[in-house]
Amino acid sequence: MKPHILYEDQDIIVCLKPAGIPTQTSRPGLPDMVSILKNHIYQNSAHKKQPYLAVIHRLDQPVEGLLVFAKTPAAAKELNRQLQSFGFGKYYQAVLLGCPQTADGILEDYLVKDGRTNTSRICTEETPDAKVARLSYHLSLIHI
């Protein structure tokens, strides 16, 4: 798979992660963005040594979006410092069937992670290891 790289220099890579591809995986033989980008760096490098690549943040496997990776330890340290100091937002766009009752709102539910299948499911607040999931939304376009 050829990565969709939006920006690359000697320190960082910004790429588009397709839906369905994990950011990284511990399962050998399955494609993930770390493997794909390490192959890209290796193929385009004159050094032909194992490339350094640090994951700065992740996106869930079903999600498509931008990812930032560091190509050097110094860049990883600086990007992580910036992330800790300033943070950043994750903004999602979705196509809905039907329309929420209000144009802005907050949806809240509880999720529990299943480590065996690496999935999460909706649960009750009383479920052991349940974590609150909160989504703030704003309808930007309504087409009737």
Where do the language-model regions lie?
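RNA pseudouridine synthases
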Residues: 1-142
